[in-house]
From Swiss-Prot:
Region of interest called Disordered, as start-end residue ranges on this chain: 224-346
Ranges of Basic and acidic residues composition bias in the record: 231-251, 260-331
GO biological process assignments: translation
Listed Pfam families: Ribosomal_S6e
GO CC term, one of those recorded: ribosome
Family: Belongs to the eukaryotic ribosomal protein eS6 family.
PANTHER family xref list: 40S RIBOSOMAL PROTEIN S6
Protein name per the record: Small ribosomal subunit protein eS6
Role according to the record: Component of the 40S small ribosomal subunit. Plays an important role in controlling cell growth and proliferation through the selective translation of particular classes of mRNA.
Keywords: Phosphoprotein, Ribonucleoprotein, Ribosomal protein
GO terms, molecular function: structural constituent of ribosome
PTM (free text): Ribosomal protein S6 is the major substrate of protein kinases in eukaryote ribosomes.
Length: 346
């Protein structure tokens, strides 16, 4: 198994090939990120502490942190996941990765020196590999040279020498410092703040104007609602008055009808009482009339007999006189006579 050991203090890294399983078994069943002593690798590694950074199996599949197994699995990976670099935006792909637990099937194991031991390792701790580029951010440059905010960062930029050309001066290349505070940056900041302030003020004015219009509209709506309610109330009252008038008229008509009926009843009672009184008076006056009629009848009969006797005694020479009409009996007398006959029969 190959051990890729890196030393961040000098920036150097070196590969060591270890074939003895007795030396490697101390790494087995350890997970990525675990720290382990390197004393078992030999006396030159005494006091060194390693941190397991990763590795590859014999087929070249990388170890992935968080996959708690010592075998190979297929995971659906997307942008931001380790062991995968998307070729298109939003692309996802199922890739084979190895678990984060170390075993004997690995071909290479990446280790980081966390603590340096007693002895130097040749090619790892005794050599320094300078960085090709220096820090670019202003805060990192200040941190590297322990500068304050008042110091000018531009004088401490790490410059890179360019290859010399024939007959020309040596040139250097310096990176553009990012997050460097200059008068232009401060001016832009003031401009942004002024725009923001103006935007806030305009928003407040627009809000005040809107609230003013809203209060006006609400007031108009309240007035409109009140007028509508009052008109509805008036219409209801007018309708109620009409209904009351109609009811009063209907009640007056009903009272008139009742009064007429009562008057008719009283008239009927009076007429019936008068009829009864007339009938009683008639019943009392009927026998007197009958007696008078009987007397008058007797007189008329005697007169008729006398006239007959006179006719017989008259001479034949005498002129014939026109016959006199018999006096007709009064209708009341005839009816009285009929009533008497009926009473006699009874």
């Amino acid at each position: 198994m190959k051990l890729n050991v890196s030393f961040p203090a000098t920036g150097a890294q070196k590969t060591f090939e270890v074939m003895d399983d007795h030396k490697l078994r101390h790494f087995y069943d350890k997970r990525m990120g675990a720290e382990i002593t390197a004393d078992h690798l030999g006396d030159e590694w005494k006091g060194y502490v390693f941190k397991i950074a990763g590795g590859n199996d014999k087929q070249g599949f990388p170890m992935k942190q968080g996959v708690l197994t010592n075998t190979r699995v297929r995971l659906l990976l997307k942008k931001g996941h380790s062991c995968y670099r998307p070729r298109r935006t939003g692309e996802r792909k199922r890739k084979s990765v190895r678990g984060c637990i170390v075993d004997q099937n690995l071909s290479a194991l990446a280790l980081i020196v966390v603590k340096k031991g007693e002895k130097d390792i040749p090619g790892l701790t005794d050599t320094t590999v300078p960085r090709r580029l220096g820090p670019k951010r202003a805060s990192n440059i200040r941190k590297l040279y322990n500068l304050t905010k008042e110091d000018d960062v531009r004088q401490f930029v790490v410059k890179r020498p360019l290859p010399e050309k024939d007959g020309k001066k040596a040139r250097t290349k310096a990176p553009k410092i990012q997050r460097l505070i200059t008068p232009v940056v401060l001016q832009r900041k003031r401009h942004r703040l002024a725009i923001k302030k103006r935007r806030v003020e305009s928003r407040k004015e627009a809000e005040a104007e809107y609230m003013k219009i809203l209060h006006l509209r609400r007031r108009q709506e309240r007035i409109r609602r009140r007028s509508r309610l009052s008109s509805m109330r008036d219409s209801r009252s007018s309708v109620g008055e009409e209904r009351d008038k109609e009811k009063e008229k209907a009640a007056a008509k009903a009272a008139k009808k009742v009064a007429k009926k009562e008057a008719k009843k009283e008239v009927k009672k009076v007429t019936e009482a008068a009829k009864k009184a007339d009938a009683k008076a008639k019943t009392k006056a009927e026998p007197k009339k009958a007696e008078k009629k009987a007397e008058t009848g007797k007189k008329t009969a005697g007169d008729k007999k006398e006239k007959k006797v006179e006719k017989k005694a008259a001479p034949a020479v005498a002129k014939k006189e026109a016959p006199k009409r018999k006096p007709e009996a009064a209708k009341g007398d005839a009816s009285a006579a009929k009533k008497e006959k009926k009473q006699k029969k009874k």
